[in-house]
């Protein structure tokens, strides 16, 4: 089963990046091209992403999966970035992390030609970054078809804060 293979690869680092956090490291998946390819194929099968006009991935590890899935599905792809990383006219939303606070921005013109968006990230923890993206999309009256992540930390129950579907390949 894919989720078991992924769990075998995911690294676990206690007290990283701060004390009390158990960091789930997805980078070993990327070193196994067969497993990475299998994961991209599986995530690409999601109706959440298939029915979206455009895919949006969250800075930075979400870009790895989002760009591959967008190519696989022949979908346009945009970035939700941290401040100071994108030029042009931007819209911004702040969020709290499990271990801090930050903001995300979109280039305003990247949203104008699309009605619906599927969100992609590597990991769902508290849901702060996803809520920031959802807030930005909602500000512009866009439809969110759902969220697709590699890993979901279910004990934090972030999915209960969303009014859209969530798909995760691995649950802890």
Curated annotation (Swiss-Prot):
UniProt-listed Enzyme Commission number(s): 2.4.2.7
Superkingdom in the source lineage: Bacteria
GO cellular component assignments: cytoplasm
GO biological process, one term: purine ribonucleoside salvage
Pathway recorded for this protein: Purine metabolism; AMP biosynthesis via salvage pathway; AMP from adenine: step 1/1
Principal location class: cytoplasm
Enzyme class: transferase
Reaction catalysed by this enzyme: AMP + diphosphate = 5-phospho-alpha-D-ribose 1-diphosphate + adenine
Stated role: Catalyzes a salvage reaction resulting in the formation of AMP, that is energically less costly than de novo synthesis.
Name of the protein in question: Adenine phosphoribosyltransferase
Biological source species: Prochlorococcus marinus (strain MIT 9215)
Gene: apt
């Amino acid at each position: 089963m894919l989720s078991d293979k992924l769990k075998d690869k995911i690294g676990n680092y206690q007290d990283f990046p701060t004390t009390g956090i158990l960091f789930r490291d997805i980078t070993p998946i990327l070193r196994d091209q067969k497993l990475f390819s299998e994961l991209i194929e599986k995530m690409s099968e999601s109706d959440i992403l298939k029915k979206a006009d455009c895919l949006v991935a969250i800075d930075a590890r979400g870009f790895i999966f989002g760009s591959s899935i967008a190519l696989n599905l022949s979908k346009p792809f945009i970035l939700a970035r941290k401040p100071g990383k994108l030029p042009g006219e931007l819209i911004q939303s702040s969020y709290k992390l499990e271990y801090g606070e930050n903001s995300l921005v979109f280039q305003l013109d990247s949203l104008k030609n699309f009605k619906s968006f599927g969100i992609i990230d590597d990991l769902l923890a508290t849901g702060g970054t996803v809520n920031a993206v959802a807030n930005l999309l909602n500000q512009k009256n866009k439809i969110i078809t759902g969220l697709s992540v590699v890993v979901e930390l279910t004990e934090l129950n972030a999915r209960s804060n969303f009014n859209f579907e969530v798909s995760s390949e691995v649950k802890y």
